[in-house]
């Protein structure tokens, strides 16, 4: 079983373009997902909701579906939506999802939402930002120090949309009793460091306490973008 805690709040724009999902598929399988929409006016909000609802409906119909197929179906849903409403052709969204089955996690990721994996005193990133900035860092064209002020840090190289091919990061890994996974949109992780998250995890015995502390930390900063955090902890009896 897992225990979960979450929040999702609008930034300065008013309408929250983030969406998330926590769904128990059967006694041992759980689906968690997070999306950060984009596309102007209502496009971003529609895109993230559309992606999350597509995942939910697919896995409710078939709990044993694989994430690769589910992500392909999300894009088909976008294509169908834009065919009916061409004004939404620029909408897109990040999408990051996990299937937790006992002690195994299957992950699929597109965009720059993140999953952090916490165990004891450690924290690692399970996703890699599919952004122009991350590519420049990988190619050592820009340093981490310069990256903080890079003006195009929000430019994504892969998103879920009707017209662009997406690049799927997929992986599987094992988790242990007490491990925690945190899903964060960029509006959240841009305002809190991995070190602070790790420290809060060490001092909060419940996942709800950790997520609450992260929210308090974020809301003490100057908020610009929508911010969403989904946390879960594996509890093996």
Model-derived segments and spans:
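PP2C/PPM-type serine/threonine phosphatase catalytic domain
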Residues: 1-237
């Amino acid at each position: 079983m897992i225990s979960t805690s979450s929040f999702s709040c609008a930034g300065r724009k008013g309408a929250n373009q983030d969406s998330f999902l926590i769904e128990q598929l059967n006694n041992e399988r759980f689906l968690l997902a997070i999306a950060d929409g984009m596309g102007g006016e209502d496009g971003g909000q529609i895109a993230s909701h559309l992606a999350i609802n597509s995942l939910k409906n697919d896995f409710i119909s078939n709990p044993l579906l694989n994430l690769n197929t589910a992500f392909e179906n999300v894009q088909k849903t976008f294509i169908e939506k834009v065919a009916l409403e061409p004004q939404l052709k620029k909408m897109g969204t990040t999408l990051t999802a996990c299937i937790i089955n006992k002690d195994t996690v299957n992950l699929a990721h597109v965009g720059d939402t993140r999953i952090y994996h916490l165990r004891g005193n450690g924290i690692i990133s399970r996703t890699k930002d599919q952004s122009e900035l991350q590519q420049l860092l990988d190619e050592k064209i820009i340093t981490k120090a310069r990256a903080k002020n890079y003006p195009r840090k929000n430019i994504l190289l892969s998103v879920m949309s009707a017209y662009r091919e997406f690049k799927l990061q997929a992986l599987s890994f094992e988790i242990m009793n007490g491990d925690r996974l945190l899903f964060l949109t960029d509006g959240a992780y841009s305002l809190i460091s991995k070190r602070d998250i790790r420290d809060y995890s060490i001092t909060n015995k419940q996942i709800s306490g950790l997520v609450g502390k992260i929210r308090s930390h974020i809301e003490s900063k100057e908020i610009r973008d929508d911010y969403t955090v989904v946390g879960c902890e594996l509890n093996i009896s």
